[in-house]
Every structure is written in structure tokens, then in C-alpha cells.
Amino acid sequence: MNKEYITAEMLMERNNMQPHVENGSFVEKHYKADPAERAASGLIYYYVAPEEITEFHRIDCDEYWCFTAGTPLSIWIIDENGVLSRTKFGITEDCEPVVYFKKGVIFASKSLSKDEGTFLSCITVPRFSPAGFELFGREEMISKFPETESFYE
């Protein structure tokens, strides 16, 4: 039997994704219809293009990233004590296929490929709220956390 695997780029195109403020592209897939209430959870599909970074940011909910297709990402996490950790996200031997971000941590990612992007699902608990989103610029990150300078190289 001939199995053809779908690429991250094909999934991005199939889902009519839009640019995200932190970089990458996304489409919201699950949400509660009543905007007056914050749903217990939310789901987006997210795509990171080759050589792209997603900017450091913090959200007011827990988040899980589940790898779907493409190439691994390098994920940088700064915990509530200001300690930086890094992990590889993907499905190769040295990667994690699911990554958990605790509410309030600062995190970012960058593509490890020049040729292929990464497609993933992001699950938030509770649902993501724009009011709980904080984006950090390069200069601010390097000033507060000098070890992040190499992220931008």
C-alpha cells in the first residue's frame, strides 16, 4: 500500500490560516459560541514557516502544543523564577511530541529547518483570551534575560 504523508505546508493551506501577532499562522478550531463566557478550553492549529521564530510571549492560561507534521522546533521557556530551559519539539528521537506551558511562563520557538515548516495543535485551558496575552520584543527580552540573545541569531 502506498501511503503519502501530508506536509505541514499542505495542512496550513488546507486550513486557510491567518497571520498571528507573535509570527506564524493560525486558525481557531474550537471555541464556545457565547463570547460573554470564557470557555473551559480552546484549540487552534498553528504553523511556523521555515526559519521563522515565534516571539517571546506570556498567556494567562495553561497551553499544550501537540506536534502534527513537519520539522522540529526549538522551544525556549522562561519559568516564573526567570530560569531559561530549552527543548526540541517534534517526533524525532531527541524531541518531545507534546510540550506543556504552565500559565504565566514566557516562551518562544524557532524553526530548525530552512526547507520545511511545522504544523501543530495548541490547546489552552481555559480558552485563550487576547486580554491575557503579553508580547515581548527582542530588546526587552535581551535586557531582562541576556541569555536569550542567542535565540535571535
Protein language model regions, located:
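Non-catalytic, conserved peripheral segments adjacent to functional cores
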Residues: 2-100, 106-109, 114-116, 122-153
